Amino acid sequence: MISLNKIIRHGVFHTERKNIRQKLSERENYIRLDLNENVLDLDASLFNEFVSGLTPEMLSAYPDLSKVYTEMATFLSVSEDELILTNGSDLAIKCLYDACIEKGDQIIVHDPYYLMYAFYASFSEAELVPIPVGADWQPDLAAMYASVTEKTKIVVIEAPSGNIGTKPSHQELRQLAAKLEQRNVLLVIDEAYHHVINNESENLDLIREFSNVVIIRTLSKVFGLAGARVGMLIGNEAIVHELYKVRPLYEISSLAAQAAKWRLAHTSLLDAYQQEISAAKVKLIEGLNRLDIPSKTTEGNFIIIYFPDTDGVDLYTLLRSHHVLIGKKYELPALQGWWRITLGNDLHHEKLLSALSTIRQQIRRIN
C-alpha cells in the first residue's frame, strides 16, 4: 500500500475537512435560514424565461464567455481587463492564493471570517492570522495593521462580514489600502454581500487609486444564484493579468454564464430585493421584540439574535426540531449566545417566530 503522506501535499494531508453532502441533502424539507441564500420567491415567468434561453450547445460546446464578460464589466463599470469570473467566490479566493501564497506566508483576517480563507491557507502551509473583532463587532483595523510583518502577503476585510454583518467605512478602507500599499501588501475586500443595502460601492474606486486592492464579489447571495456558482475578482489590469494565469481553462460553465446574463438583464430585481429585505428586517425584529429576544440588524441579508444555550442544548438544535435551520454557533467567546438568521419571506418568519415562542414556553415550564 502506498504512503499517501509521501504523495499528498503536506498542507493538504494534515488538514481536516468535513464532508457536507449529507448535511446539504437534509435541508430540502426545512425552512432554510442558515446559509444566507436568497430564499425569496422567484416569479415563475422569470424562471421560465431563463429556461427558454437554454440551448443544446450550452451542454455540448465549451463555454464562450465573451458576452458574459462584456455584460458583467458594463454592469460593474469596469473594463474586462479588470475582471476575472470564477466558479463562486470560493474559487476567487483560491485564485488569489494560487497566484500569491507560498509556504510560510501570512494572511491576516478579522475573526469571525469566511472559512475558505483558512482552508486554502492550510493547504499552502501558510499562516492565517485571525484578529478578533472589537467590542462593537467591527473589524479592528488598527490591530490588523499592527499584525503585518514581512511575511504578510494579504489582508482580508469582509465588507460586510458574512458572519456578523459589520463593515468598516470606505474612508477607513481607503486609509488601510494606502498604508498596506507602502508595505507591499494586498488588501482584499470581500463584498459577497454587496447589493443587500444598495447598488453602489465606493470601494471599486480603490482599484484604480491604489495598486494593491482586489475586490471579491459573488452572485450567490442577493442575485439568488448560489447553485450556479458565479463569483468574480476585480482589480487593476496589472494584478488581474497575473491572477488570470492561474484560472481554469474555462472560468465558469455555459449554464452559469447564461444564469448570470439572465440576472443582469433584470437588475430591477435588485431594487425589489433590497426593499423586501429592508422591510423583512423591521418586521422580524418587531416580532422578536414581542418575544423579548434581543437582536441586532446587519449590513447583510441576515440578522443576529441572542438566545443562550438551555440545559446544554443550543438554539440550532431546538429550531431544527421545528424544521427551521439557522446559522451554526459562533466560536468566538465574545459572540457566545448570538445566532445568525437569514432573512426570508413573511411565511418563513412566521414559522420561525412560532417555533421560538414554543421553545420559550417550554423553557419557562422547565424552569
Each model region followed by its residue ranges:
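Conserved PLP-binding catalytic core of the aspartate aminotransferase-like
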Residues: 278, 290-322, 345
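PLP-dependent aminotransferase class I/II
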Residues: 212-289, 293-296
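PLP-dependent enzyme catalytic core of the Aspartate aminotransferase-like
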Residues: 321-322, 331-367
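Short acidic capping loops at alpha-helix termini that bridge into adjacent secondary structure
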Residues: 79-83, 103-106, 151, 184, ...
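Conserved small-domain helix->loop->beta segment predominantly found in fold-type I
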Residues: 282-307, 328-337, 367
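PLP-dependent aminotransferase-like
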Residues: 99-157
